Amino acid sequence: MSLDALQQRLGYRFSKPELLQQALTHRSHSAMHNERLEFLGDSILNCAVADMLYGMFGKLDEGDLSRVRANLVKQQALYEIAQMLQLPDALRLGEGELKSGGFRRPSILADALEAIFGAVFLDGGFDAARTLIRKLYIPILEQVDPRTLGKDAKTLLQEYLQGHKIALPLYTVVATHGAAHNQQFEVECSIPKLEIRVSGSGASRRAAEQSAAKLALDEAHRLVPQLVKRSRAERTGKTRKQATPPDPQLSLRLKE
């Protein structure tokens, strides 16, 4: 992808395009890499997201706001935004990193996105960087349920199952589709005790697992209450059976 095409996707045009080029450059490619820009962008991202959360979630306390922010700026969240921007097609990697599939690596893509935020800050100032971050994050924030503190589907599924003493789900890659630079993964999520078996897809194994986990969580929310109700009924039946006193007339008849 050309720098011009990426700038169109970002909705921001650099006065110094070399900053964007540096933000896309991995240390395996050249000495003028993106690690310092990533350091800068990380701080700007945290500040901008904190500002948005402060304005959107007035009822959350400091601890909950911090937890929501942590979930929104972690590697997986950044990776998914990078995929949406098609950053894998714009990265500058060394030959070895390119051959090993570095353009798909979540850490490399997340770092490049943070470096872009740093580059925009140096090029246009904090307001420009904040505007870009808001543009990318508002659609995500609109879907955040403050009750779950922005946790991803895999985390929510794990916590829900642990809360009901059900074994954790199993994730299995069942298929991959497409060329090496544009693969789609299909992952199956299974929960044997609930007889749940669902599949999700995504541009990475992690994204596909998240997709499958969301479907499994929906199914678990539907099935677990039924399982709990059935289990309680069985326990109640056993208790009543044990509490029923023996019939003395029946005992006499059996002796005769």
Curated annotation (Swiss-Prot):
Mg(2+) binds at residues 38, 111, 114. SUPFAM superfamilies: dsRNA-binding domain-like, RNase III domain-like. It catalyses: Endonucleolytic cleavage to 5'-phosphomonoester. It is found in: Cytoplasm. Residues 152-222 form the DRBM domain. Its cofactor is Mg(2+). InterPro entries: dsRBD_dom (IPR014720), RNase_III (IPR011907), RNase_III_dom (IPR000999), RNase_III_sf (IPR036389). This is Ribonuclease 3. Residues 226-256 are annotated as: Disordered. The keyword tRNA processing applies. The keyword Metal-binding applies. The gene is rnc. Its main location: cytoplasm. It comes from Ralstonia pickettii (strain 12J). Signal peptide: none annotated. It holds the Pfam family Ribonucleas_3_3. GO terms for cellular component: cytoplasm. Keywords: Cytoplasm, Endonuclease, Hydrolase, Magnesium, Metal-binding, mRNA processing, Nuclease, RNA-binding, rRNA processing, rRNA-binding, tRNA processing.
